Amino acid sequence: MHCPFCGKYDTKVTDSRLVAEGDQVRRRRQCNDCGERFTTYETAELVMPRVIKGDGSRETFDERKLRAGMLRALEKRPVSAESIEAAVERIRQRLRARGEREIEAREIGEEVMRSLKRLDQVAYIRFASVYRRFQDLDEFRAEIDRLAQEPSFSPDDADKR
């Protein structure tokens, strides 16, 4: 690594430590030429899969779209920002863990629905109504009935999934 002070490439690592819950390595370095010390942080570069949209077009995964869709469904609901961010991160981790280069937008929508079902059932119904394009009250009722048949989750369960 080159020295940010003198630009030479002859540096040595003097200390390495895990930080950020083990997701990052902090390294103290020293330039062998000018003697200056500096810190670098190393993280794994994890590429998200490309998204195959319903019309067959492809686009880069956009975490902002994921978060915006969830926030829209959770608007004015008693769910903390921390819980929402944790859910977004869990979805990202599950998508990355698949190891696929591409994923259908439908599958991302299903992941969002699973997360919302655990976070807030009203938000789940809101999202499902748009995502599944409910046309009338009967479709709402059917989804609510399906939801009522499933075992309920406590907020603590959402953190475990």
Curated annotation (Swiss-Prot):
Cofactor: binding details: Binds 1 zinc ion.
Keywords (A to Z) from UniProt: ATP-binding, DNA-binding, Metal-binding, Nucleotide-binding, Repressor, Transcription, Transcription regulation, Zinc, Zinc-finger
Cofactor(s) recorded in Swiss-Prot or TrEMBL: Zn(2+)
Positions of unnamed zinc fingers: 3-34
One Gene Ontology term of the molecular function aspect: ATP binding
TM stretches of this protein: none
ATP-cone domain location: 49-139
Family: Belongs to the NrdR family.
Cited PANTHER family: TRANSCRIPTIONAL REPRESSOR NRDR
Record's function text: Negatively regulates transcription of bacterial ribonucleotide reductase nrd genes and operons by binding to NrdR-boxes.
NCBIfam families: transcriptional regulator NrdR
Protein name as annotated: Transcriptional repressor NrdR
Organism: Chromohalobacter salexigens (strain ATCC BAA-138 / DSM 3043 / CIP 106854 / NCIMB 13768 / 1H11)
